[in-house]
């Protein structure tokens, strides 16, 4: 069956923050770049939202690994998590670590063991506050660290390598305990988040499916469905989003400049 690619209806997903470029990854290899153009589960796709998509590879990742969520810094460095423990460049990284790829070398941007994250936990949300500021992270199961109970739909602020605050508090917002965040991006702001979940659900009165991307304006608590990846390609009927990053027009980063 031929793959059907559709241009997203941007007007249908309009919001206060203009996104100039969207990056996303899937949990399985699929032709999500274009018809007959494959991206593996170690890759991500860079999409200009005008019909042009490009496969991006992080060199050196083992074929058996899956790229979870990721953050692309303005200098081109990539911060990301993997679904398995791996040795890269002589350093061992746990699934809850955040790996930094910069100039051909790998290092730890977040040390899960030092932060008190138990073994068996996976990091599945990686972003930065504002553009190149503090890390925002999410994890796949509930655990306690540094005085916080961290839940799968929480977004945690990291200060000096430790959990310091909840940027998104799932319990306080009344989220279903079944919800798990698998992708986040702050869109170059300290006020907004782009979010992907690993299942369908409802948040803030907005009902969504597995491959929808939502945004939330944190000061007002208003949620909006921004993108339905199923409208980008029919391959999203079998592939599932597990990483998002966005390039925002920083002129409007607070939504009112």
Question: What residue spans do the PLM features occupy?
Answer:
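Bacterial N-terminal signal peptides
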Residues: 1-9
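Non-transmembrane domains of secretory- and envelope-associated proteins
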Residues: 251-253
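Sequence/structural signature of beta-propeller domains
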Residues: 13-249
